[in-house]
Amino acid sequence: MEAIDELSQLSDSMRQAASLLADEDPDETSSSRRPATSLNVVALGNVGAGKSAVLNSLIGHPVLPTGENGATRAPIIIDLSREESLSSKAIILQIDNKNQQVSASALRHSLQDRLSKGASGRGRDEIYLKLRTSTAPPLKLIDLPGLDQRIVDDSMIGEHAQHNDAILLVVVPASQASEISSSRALKIAKEYDPESTRTVGIISKIDQAAENPKSLAAVQALLSNQGPPKTTDIPWVALIGQSVSIASAQSGGSENSLETAWRAESESLKSILTGAPQSKLGRIALVDTLASQIRSRMKLRLPNILTGLQGKSQIVQDELARLGEQLVSSAEGTRAIALELCREFEDKFLLHLAGGEGSGWKVVASFEGNFPNRIKKLPLDRHFDLNNVKRIVLEADGYQPYLISPEKGLRSLIKTVLELAKDPARLCVDEVHRVLVDIVSASANATPGLGRYPPFKREVVAIASAALDGFKNEAKKMVVALVDMERAFVPPQHFIRLVQRRMERQRREEELKGRSSKKGQDAEQSLLNRATSPQPDGPSSTGGSLKSLRDKLMPQDKDKDKEKETPEVSGLKTAGPEGEITAGYLMKKSAKTNGWSRRWFVLNEKTGKLGYTKKQEERNFRGTVTLEECSIEEISDDEGEKSKSSKDKKSNGPDSKGPGLVFKITCRVPYKTVLKAHNALVLKAESMVDKNEWINKLQKVIQARGGQVGSASMRQSLSEGSLDKMVRKPVDPEEELRWMSQEVRGYVEAVLNSLAANVPKAVVLCQVEKSKEDMLNQLYSSISAIGNERIESLIQEDQNVKRRRDRYQKQSSLLSKLTRQLSIHDNRAAAASSWSDNSGTESSPRTNGGSSGEDWMNAFNAAASGPDSLKRYGSGGHSRRYSDPAQNGEDSSGSGGSSRRTTPNRLPPAPPQSGSSYRY
């Protein structure tokens, strides 16, 4: 009975869980309306099989009419509930939530009268009774009319038997046990429960078949699981069926009359069925069998229900998190909620801004795309046109004529051009401001708490937008100040370098002029020496001796003359379909050691890049130079060698340095590097031919990509005659002014590049970082300045939201309770089932294998032989053929079973103490 009580609690929990999973109101009144079929017991049998007597035995009171005049003519449903405080004789009838104490005889006569009145008609109205006693298990008993009556059809049976959890009680009288295979009740049970997982067989009226050996043999075969194949998977229980009536008739006011009757019933059954398992005899065995079947059915449903509850719990928690906490009905609570919502909004804002969600990537896109493009599109060509530069310089009030010192005009030009950078900077600030405003709107929409209070959401967006406007104004002031800073102060060193470079140009021109005149003098002296030297007439001539003496004294000059007479060949290699790739060795000056390293250089004219490797066989460049923003100029060997150590000079010798083999590659933008971290790349060719070819090709690439070439290298590429003409020309004022404008443009471009790098930093500082740090403070200060009435008007919760929150809170509480209860019941039910299966191995229909049809017929033949053969089924002459496997020393698990259901591999707890705990 205790097991039934636990199953009743489990059934109630499962009913509430089903209501929750069906999204019904978790209130007990509404969930109780959902029918629970796990504790339903449907009695199936023919007229006179003893169905009502068996149900009376379960109730503990003769409530249902029995006998010929009490045949069931309509379905009778008795909903039982157990109350231990009642006496064993008390019966409480519940009608419309009202309790009325009645007697068993009064209920029986009332039911008999109703059945008699309805016998004339063909009505199928059910009779429903709700009883509360201390003797009955909490089950719902359904007594159907006899299956052989005309009023019984498939729809009436299916209405109650089709539920997956309803227990089917197949009632067969002992006198018809030998004909069990043809029982209609068994066929119907097999139709609705093919695996017999919710079927219990009852053999009633054992006392009436005590004198029929054949019937007793068939009963013992069924109880010993040796019946026909269709009965071996059904647990069978034997009952007398009249124990309750006998106890009621013989009761003399004792509370133990029912227990006495049930013990008497068990003793009578033991004396009649001497070879049957004792665990299958009597009313107590019936209750245990019902509990086992109900537990098995519930165990199948529990995992799915628990899984559904876990998923439902997650859904409920997500909804509660989305709906938020309940609003506190006070001024302080309302203000606290407002500040907490500001905190939630700020978290979402930072997530969108710093985490890259939403439109955060547009800030970086503005810095890397739109703003640099606007800087590059500034009309520098128009401002640095020679005519415009000349006009500005002429209009400026310089200290000296502009050809000598046009400093003031050039300063004015620099300020005018840098003024153009203010508009792109302001546009960059406006773009970032629009992005931040979009992020504010997206963050407000993504904040769950603000969604519940639309007026407060609009207020938060307005406060945040006003704060962003202030940050935007500060950022505009900052970027304009950056531009004005560059405009206001042009370093004097820039103009000093202009003069220095002009003087350097003049010095180089003088050097080139001196070199050309020296070459002419050397050529004239060589011709004079050849003309004055005598021809060698013989070996003893004086001229010959003088020539030989000169050859001995000047062997090196002779070798040099031979080298001059032999034309040099370039060592560079070309490749590609159009010869666009040039490769060869160059000496690269190291910045660390100040020494020269021989490297393999490769120039790609299509890509405009110069790369080098340590060896010719290497495939990956150690460094590359982009020639687009570079300039090339020739430097003297003295400048290239001045950083060499004296040790290197001694090792190379006095004549190791070649004449004019060094040139330098630099970047037109002062703060940029050419190669790795170096601002200049100093190279030295192996010969003058290689140098000229390298310089010509590098100049070609640089000029094709908009670069500029140093003046020295340009003059070096000209012929000597044209160079002399250029040196002898007077200074061209326009050429000088053009050169100065180019220098000033280089400075302006460097400043613009610097602004392109620094303006985004100012924008990030004044707008992005400022909004990260001060957004919450702005919200807090603005909300704190609002009055209580204004805040309460802004934070008004929707009533629908409030009702939904209350509903989900109830569901959450009930879900946690049901999950805990069902988990405990699942473990207990599994443990109890495992213990029951282990302890009842001898009598369990699923542990013993089903007997064949031949064994079934032998049992009838032995019963028909006479009393001597029947003794073999008693306790003294127990037959080994039909005896229990445990008594034969056989392993019950090894017998050939038909459909054995294994129990879970879980260790059960210690079994409960049996004895007086079964009061009923």
UniProtKB/Swiss-Prot annotation:
GO CC terms: cell plate; clathrin-coated endocytic vesicle; cytosol; microtubule; nucleus; plant-type vacuole; plasma membrane; plasmodesma
Tissue specificity field: Ubiquitous. Preferentially expressed in siliques.
Residue positions where N-acetylmethionine is found in the record: 1
Residue ranges of coiled coil: 788-812
Catalysed reactions listed for this entry: GTP + H2O = GDP + phosphate + H(+)
Region described as G2 motif: spans on this chain: 71-73
Important for homodimerization: annotated span: 747-761
GED domain sequence ranges: 737-830
Region of interest (G3 motif), residue spans: 143-146
Region G1 motif, residue ranges: 45-52
Keywords, alphabetical: Acetylation, Cell membrane, Coiled coil, Cytoplasm, Cytoplasmic vesicle, Cytoskeleton, GTP-binding, Hydrolase, Membrane, Microtubule, Motor protein, Nucleotide-binding
Disruption phenotype: Basal shift of ARAC3/ROP6 and ARAC4/ROP2 positioning in root hair-forming cells leading to basal shift of root hair positions.
First-level EC class: hydrolase
GO molecular function list: clathrin binding; GTP binding; GTPase activity
Region feature (Disordered): 507-577, 632-657, 828-920
Compositionally biased intervals (Basic and acidic residues): 507-522, 548-567, 641-652
Keyword Mitochondrion (UniProt): no
Binding site for GTP: 45-53, 204-210, 246-249
Ranges where the PH domain occurs: 579-703
Oligomer and partners: Interacts with DRP1A at the plasma membrane and in forming clathrin-coated vesicles (CCV).
Function of the protein: Putative microtubule-associated force-producing protein, able to bind and hydrolyze GTP. Collaboratively with DRP1A, participates in clathrin-coated vesicle formation during endocytosis. With DRP1A and PIP5K3, required for the precise coordination of polar ARAC3/ROP6 and ARAC4/ROP2 placement and subsequent root hair positioning during planar polarity formation in root hair-forming cells.
Protein name listed in UniProt: Dynamin-2B
Provenance organism: Arabidopsis thaliana
